[in-house]
């Protein structure tokens, strides 16, 4: 069963499932980030401004990654297709990089703690990625090798990559593929739970930025695992680029956590301490309640 990528047509306007899911993912991620910001004592209203800025940077970065990936196959001869984002084709590694650059610029301009805010955004990012992966099902992207498992999915001829373009050997009606996008979505949801748990369980021991580094470790390992099964990989030097990025992200994320803690390059539980200091300051600034007047003693008579 194949789904029409266009969810709704209104005259000349086509609304694609990919765009709808992108919007749902962004709102869901912002909702979670808002809750995390409040829990950490930050201004939750900043989340929506950051969402717009990070979304622009993320779309540019993810599209650029995809275009470079598919340049020889698609865009060299059809450069006009580069701007047709609604047809799919967004690379998450590029999106993360673009969003991080945009968010760094926003926090610098507004004098906010960049590391603390990417901690707030890390679980939200995984949630958004999990939801966005459903779009890969609609667009028939991010699938693995053929499988006989009951949850295998069909892929039509137009979206096949070699050697699965040979329909005599891999008929459309009887060949089903691993839904790698679904595996990633489930692992991302598990990652959301892990990051939220770590952020709460070890709050007094974590430095600002630790949760974000854990995001890179988690997602890097997930992508490395799944890319070993993916078809149509972008390969450099015989190694899929996504695996290089995944391994690099996981190693760097883990190294940053270990080195910072070994050298004491941070303040454990910084946001908790600041919240406690603010509460203490507010308590001192609040004048004590005036004592109630004593009731007159009854006269003897």
PLM feature segments, named:
Residues 1-301:
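A feature for loop-to-transmembrane-helix boundaries and adjacent hydrophobic helices
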């Amino acid at each position: 069963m194949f789904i029409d990528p266009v969810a709704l047509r209104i005259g000349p306007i086509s609304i694609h499932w990919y765009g709808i899911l992108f919007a749902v993912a962004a709102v869901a991620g912002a909702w979670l980030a808002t809750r995390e910001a409040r829990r950490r004592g930050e201004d939750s209203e900043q989340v929506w401004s950051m969402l717009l800025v990070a979304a622009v940077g993320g779309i540019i970065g993810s599209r650029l990654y995809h275009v470079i990936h598919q340049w020889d196959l698609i865009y060299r001869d059809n450069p006009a297709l580069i701007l047709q984002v609604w047809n799919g084709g967004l690379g998450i590694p590029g999106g993360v990089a673009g969003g991080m650059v945009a968010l760094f610029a926003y926090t610098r301009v507004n004098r906010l703690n960049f590391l603390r805010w990417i901690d707030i955004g890390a679980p939200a990012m995984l949630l958004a990625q999990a939801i966005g992966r459903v779009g890969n099902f609609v667009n028939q992207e991010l699938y693995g090798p053929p499988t006989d498992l009951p949850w295998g999915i069909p892929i039509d001829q137009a979206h096949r990559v070699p050697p699965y373009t040979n329909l005599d050997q891999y008929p459309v009606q009887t060949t089903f593929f691993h839904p790698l996008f679904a595996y990633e979505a489930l692992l991302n949801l598990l990652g959301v739970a892990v990051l939220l748990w770590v952020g709460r369980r070890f709050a007094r021991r974590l430095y600002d930025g630790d949760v974000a580094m854990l995001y890179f470790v988690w997602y890097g390992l997930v992508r490395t695992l799944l890319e070993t099964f993916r078809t149509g990989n972008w390969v450099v030097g015989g190694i899929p680029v996504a695996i290089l990025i995944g391994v690099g992200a996981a190693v760097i994320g883990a190294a940053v956590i270990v080195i910072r803690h070994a050298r004491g390059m941070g303040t454990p539980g910084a946001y908790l301490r600041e919240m406690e200091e603010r509460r203490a300051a507010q308590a001192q600034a609040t004048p004590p309640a005036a004592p109630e007047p004593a009731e007159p003693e009854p006269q003897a008579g």
